[in-house]
């Protein structure tokens, strides 16, 4: 009976092979003394690989309070799909939601379509880049704006020490067509070291840069985090 009940699952896996990998990086800082600081940083990633395609979703949440006053409150959610039509070339679809209300970015929704190139993909390293056209819907300081844009993305991983250590860099650059809006760059750079099969230490730098930010906001927002990562 148990063998028969397992047969449908085996057939499903054969028809629709799944290679799903997810991880969650967490960093929490609390300090007190002359001032009290609370910082929470969470990065979640999930990647599903198929025969000719790949789905990837990411979620970043970053908050900071100093003396009970919120000094950072950022949300960044992305989804991307790759459809390979050759061993190295692929079509790409991407969507991103970004919010940083303390910089008067009430929301930024980006929809992109384009093409990408897998520069290399080996057991020790991988690099891909893509270029596409985007539609950017923004609400800045309560004002709604809509603009076309050009998007350039990079995704790089390098493994060391029999894949126990990983260096990575991810970048998305938006060149927004609206006059005076300029470019928006988001990136994550970091190192991970495996402490066990499921847990690793994670050091990461997250950058948000705007050439022409809303009035009163800084161009650069750079966050460093040191925490633990869980793979599942």
Predicted regions and their residues:
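Solvent-exposed loop/turn segments connecting transmembrane beta-strands
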Residues: 30-38, 66-72, 100-107, 140-146, ...
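Outer-membrane beta-barrel "beta-signal"
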Residues: 112, 220-232
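Detector for outer-membrane/organellar transmembrane beta-barrel domains
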Residues: 124-175
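Transmembrane beta-barrel strands of outer-membrane/channel proteins
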Residues: 26-28, 57-63, 77-81, 93-97, ...
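Transmembrane beta-strands of outer-membrane beta-barrel pores
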Residues: 28-32, 50, 61-65, 97-101, ...
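Outer-membrane beta-barrel architecture
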Residues: 25-27, 43-45, 80, 114-119, ...
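Compositionally biased alpha-helical segments
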Residues: 1-27, 31, 36, 41-45
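Repeated loop/turn-to-beta-strand initiation elements of outer-membrane beta-barrel proteins
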Residues: 51-57, 88-91, 123-127, 159-167, ...
């Amino acid at each position: 009976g148990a063998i028969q009940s397992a047969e449908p699952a085996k057939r499903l896996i054969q028809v629709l092979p799944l290679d799903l990998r997810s991880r969650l990086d967490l960093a929490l800082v609390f300090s007190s003394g002359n001032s009290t600081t609370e910082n929470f940083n969470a990065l979640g990633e999930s990647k599903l690989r198929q025969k000719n395609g790949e789905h990837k979703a990411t979620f970043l949440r970053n908050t900071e309070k100093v003396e009970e006053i919120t000094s950072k409150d950022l949300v960044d959610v992305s989804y991307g799909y790759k459809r390979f039509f050759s061993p190295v070339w692929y079509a790409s679809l991407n969507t991103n939601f970004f919010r940083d209300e303390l910089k008067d970015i009430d929301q930024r929704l980006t929809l992109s379509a384009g093409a990408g190139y897998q520069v290399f993909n080996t057991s020790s390293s991988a690099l891909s880049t893509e270029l596409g056209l985007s539609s950017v819907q923004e609400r800045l300081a309560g004002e709604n704006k809509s603009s076309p844009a050009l998007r350039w993305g990079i995704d790089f991983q390098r493994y060391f020490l029999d894949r126990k250590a990983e260096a990575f860099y991810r970048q998305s650059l938006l060149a927004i067509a609206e006059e005076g809006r300029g470019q928006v760059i988001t990136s994550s750079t970091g190192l991970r070291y495996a402490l066990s099969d499921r847990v690793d230490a994670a050091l990461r730098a997250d950058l948000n840069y705007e050439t022409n930010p809303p009035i009163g906001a800084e161009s650069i927002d750079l966050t460093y985090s040191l925490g633990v990562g869980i793979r599942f």
